[in-house]
Amino acid sequence: MVQHITLHDMTLRDGMHPKRHQISLEQMKDIARGLDAAGVPLIEVTHGDGLGGASVNYGFPAHSDEEYLRAVLGELKQARVSALLLPGIGTVDHLRMAHEIGVHTIRVATHCTEADVSEQHIGMARKLGMDTVGFLMMAHMAPVQTLVQQALLMESYGANCLYITDSAGHMLPHDVTEKLGAVRQALRPETELGFHGHHNLAMGVANSLAAIACGASRIDAAAAGLGAGAGNTPMEVLVAVCERMGIETGVDVYRIADVAEDLVVPIMDHPIRIDRDALTLGYAGVYSSFLLFAKRAEAKYRIPAREILVELGRQRLVGGQEDMIEDTAITLARERGLLVP
């Protein structure tokens, strides 16, 4: 088992989803200062869907990516900043902007079977000298050998770290062990391995520990779990558990707990918890950021969000297909006579 890990904070990026991308600059700066003082080494900052995510499909943020990034970068004493980029949403120009203003790490994210679309962005990030991460989303949807092949593609493009991402919070510890173990064995020894979890089945901490046992040295978490669905792995809990297990994180357990309680919980629009809809995300294997879209469709078409999410899982929809959520709700409403054709 790895004895020292890098914790990567998601509060100011994945946490944008439950906030409908409306975190203010002052809130960003306050939380970033708290994370920095607690010893968190890497903080991700962008629209919830990454650089360039501002759109009708994904939602318009209170401020631009550049404004958020500049605000946070100006507050940090030791932590570095990362940005997420999904090819097809974010562009090479977004990547250059992030590099020019001081972003250290770029994470290029694709669906777990579509690593080939990341070549241009990973190659450019490496050319710019950035810490470059390949980020394979919805990893529960691909068999082990497919994940291995996709990870090796990203590594061949220049990624120096590969993430296996449980975007739906669907994986259990044995799934993590099987998939990350195989990927770790296939990658070059110098290529780092990371894990990003969601807490929809309350497996965030357990899955992170399983990942660490497989050799993952980078683990994503969020203060108070602020993130899509039932949230990300709660950082304050993970730090406490790691400390008890002798795994070094460099993060102060009391300070990160204070950030969660005093800075993050007060800005929540609703409690980040495993309600019936978030549970359905994990159980049915649905992309966590679909949750609020399904709740909005429920209010509009009188179809329970849970039933919409189950149907999305049956259709195996993936990130980027947010426009299909309303279509699915309309179809279900028509089938039940709730809409007149």
Swiss-Prot record:
Residues 5-257 form the Pyruvate carboxyltransferase domain. It is an enzyme of class 4 (lyase). Its EC number is 4.1.3.39. One of its GO terms (molecular function) is 2-isopropylmalate synthase activity. The active site is at residue 17. Keywords: Aromatic hydrocarbons catabolism, Lyase, Manganese, Metal-binding. It catalyses: (S)-4-hydroxy-2-oxopentanoate = acetaldehyde + pyruvate. GO terms for biological process: catabolic process; L-leucine biosynthetic process. InterPro entries: 2-IPM_HCS-like, 4OH_2_O-val_aldolase, Aldolase_TIM, DmpG_comm, DRE_TIM_HOA, PYR_CT. The record marks 13 as: Transition state stabilizer. Mn(2+) binds at residues 14, 196, 198. The keyword Manganese applies. Belongs to the 4-hydroxy-2-oxovalerate aldolase family. HAMAP family: HOA. This is 4-hydroxy-2-oxovalerate aldolase 3. It comes from Cupriavidus necator (strain ATCC 17699 / DSM 428 / KCTC 22496 / NCIMB 10442 / H16 / Stanier 337). The lineage of its organism: Bacteria, Pseudomonadati, Pseudomonadota, Betaproteobacteria, Burkholderiales.
